Amino acid sequence: MESSSDPQIIAIAGLPPPDTNLTANTAASDRAAIITVLILALIAIALRFTARNIQQTKIHWDDWVIIISMALVGGTAGLAIAGGHYGAGKHIWAVDLDSLQQIYKILFGYTFLYSASCAVIKISILLFYSRIFLSTERLFALSMKFGYFLSISYPIVVWVTMGNVCRPLDHFWTQFAGTKGTCIDINTFFLALGIINMINDFYILLIPIPHIFRLQMSLRKRIGIAGILMLGGFVCAASAVRIHFLTELSKTKDVTRAMGPVFIWSDLEPCIAIVSACLPHLAPLRHIVRDKISSTFGSQDDEVELTNRITGGSAAGHAASTQSSSAENIHRQGIHVHTSYTQQTDQR
């Protein structure tokens, strides 16, 4: 076993445990998982734009931004697959020094794209919030501004830190060859970033909830709308799993083996985020399916009804109009809220 391992790798990681299978390699399954979630994200975006076409509504900024995020996630997926080619998913004793250095070069670039993709997805979601919730409340405005701050500052912190992660910078991947230099505690840094990103996910997920529960509709229907938006909770779950694997990476010398699941979940997390960001826009497609089922089985329409009585010139009418405006915006963006107005005009 000793003779089959690169002596320079043994100098770094020590001898492999006696029961280690040096032929084990998860690269193929890792690649399949990454491609699968990437395709799901692409399908979600395609359905989102199909729904736009059905509604005959214009493409908004949040739609364009989600496309940018998809391009970034595609870049991270390509790097993750390249990492598997060089040995991510194998035991460290089954790779040579050159391959290990290539993996760390990939990891360096991957970090920049991953942090950017997370930020862009969050910005797309915030742009969506700003369109459907036409609120002038100070608390909501501050919540949105803080959400933008968290989203934009995250990649900036990552980029600045990674730009100074080692002195000299190439020591990040040449350190295994015994070059002279210093680096920060990289694994702890990655773990901290994972936790911060998950906290940001939770925060952005919760921003619209108070506003939704002030809409003029039944509690059951408000819970339904909140539930659609809260599907983003799957992203938080994916973040938690990713943090687990980052923790495992920080504890082991078998870093290449541990990088396999880290790469998977670092791609799965933003892909789930893209799917979750697209789900609220897909109601027109659901309604087409529902209408076909209704015509076949005679089921009743269960769309959310919101009725406002607007009395000309009254303060109450103005407040009702503001609430209904938010609800109608939700309908246009895919969460189907049907708004009917009754205009009463005094006959003179």
Model-derived regions, located:
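Extracellular TM2-ECL1-early TM3 structural module of rhodopsin-like
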Residues: 75-118, 183-192
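First transmembrane helix
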Residues: 29-55, 116-123
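Flexible, low-complexity linker/tail segments at the boundary of structured domains
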Residues: 249-272, 279-348
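Extracellular N-terminal segment of 7TM GPCRs
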Residues: 1-43
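Extracellular loop 3-seventh transmembrane helix
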Residues: 34, 107-118, 181-200, 222-290
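Helix-to-loop junction signature of class
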Residues: 75-92, 157-178, 196-212, 234-262, ...
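Interfacial segments of alpha-helical transmembrane regions
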Residues: 61-71, 121-158, 220-231
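Juxtamembrane membrane-interface segments at transmembrane-helix boundaries in membrane proteins
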Residues: 16-31, 97-106, 180-186
